[in-house]
Swiss-Prot record:
Catalytic activity: dihydroxyacetone phosphate = methylglyoxal + phosphate
Protein name listed in UniProt: Methylglyoxal synthase
Stored SUPFAM superfamilies: Methylglyoxal synthase-like (SSF52335)
Alphabetized UniProt keyword annotations: Lyase
EC number: 4.2.3.3
Pfam entry (one): MGS
Name of encoding gene: mgsA
UniProt keyword annotation of Cytoplasm present: no
Cross-referenced InterPro entries: Methylgl_synth, Methylglyoxal_synth_AS, MGS-like_dom, MGS-like_dom_sf
Keyword field contains Lyase: yes
Family (UniProt): Belongs to the methylglyoxal synthase family.
Matching CDD domains: MGS
PANTHER family from the UniProt entry: METHYLGLYOXAL SYNTHASE
């Protein structure tokens, strides 16, 4: 796979996702970092987004609920370059019927080289980083080169 440089902007598009047993934890994290989050474009899966928006007043673009395809919707947005960071508080103790979607979402985040926080401390580290509100260079798959190579049969 060939890679190319692709900047993450100073004002990032942040996807917020939480399993049912972690929604209150994510809400508490959003409250703690309210001022920092206001400067970014926020999106969330349906129920999580509605809760955060109602309880914090943050503007949240609400996607479909996770079990109905919201995790895959976030993944699609990552591949389109429309998500710069993922904060995903998942419950390691509770199996979910859409666990394959969760695994796919984490894989896509790794493929497209976006930062992922899976708990309060890792999310705190992201907000505390100077990279949270400054442009950052990263390498992503060069899809055009990939398609050109595939079209040639390689």
């Amino acid at each position: 796979m060939e890679y190319k440089q692709s900047p993450l902007p100073a004002n990032k598009a942040i996807a917020l996702v939480a399993h049912d047993n972690k929604k209150q934890d994510l809400l508490a994290w959003c409250r703690k970092h309210l001022d920092a989050l206001r400067h970014h474009q926020l999106m969330a899966t349906g129920t999580t987004g509605a809760l955060i928006e109602r309880e914090t007043g943050l503007a949240i673009h609400k996607l479909i609920s996770g079990p109905l395809g919201g995790d895959q919707q976030v993944g699609a947005l990552i591949t389109e370059g429309k998500v710069d960071m993922l904060v995903f508080f998942w419950d390691p103790f509770e199996p979910m019927p859409h666990d394959p979607d969760v695994k796919a979402l984490l894989r896509i985040a790794a493929v497209w080289n976006i930062p992922v926080a899976c708990n309060q401390v890792s999310a705190d580290f992201m907000v505390a980083s100077p990279c949270f509100s400054t442009p950052v260079e990263r390498l992503i798959p060069d899809y055009a080169a990939y398609m050109a190579r595939r079209a040639q049969g390689n």
